[in-house]
Amino acid sequence: MQKMTETDRYVTFKGIDGDGNARRLVAMLRRHIDDPAKTNLFWEKFKEKLELAESPDTNNTRRLDELFLIHSYINNIYDLLEEHGDQEALTLLHQIEVESC
């Protein structure tokens, strides 16, 4: 687990790697949603949105990114990670919620 540094969310986001944390969480999340035994139609649609985040030119100039998607679907993500007992990802999700959402 990485060492927590002092952050300054409300003024500058100083010390917060929001994009990096979001990318790390998506990698953890993909361990679950890429598993055919764990996915469903909701997560398949979520993966389509992740693809759009990776290529904004294909989304009619609408900018999506991992942090936006995490914020938009935070409760669904919590439910999935709790269901599969992924404590490491839950800890990171909570950190993202506190620091960046």
From Swiss-Prot:
GO biological process, one term: nitrogen fixation
Keywords attached to this entry: Nitrogen fixation
InterPro entries: CowN (IPR024899)
Highest taxon of source: Bacteria
Reported function: Is required to sustain N(2)-dependent growth in the presence of low levels of carbon monoxide (CO). Probably acts by protecting the N(2) fixation ability of the nitrogenase complex, which is inactivated in the presence of CO.
UniProt record similarity statement: Belongs to the CowN family.
Name used for this protein in its record: N(2)-fixation sustaining protein CowN
Organism: Pelobacter propionicus (strain DSM 2379 / NBRC 103807 / OttBd1)
Gene: cowN
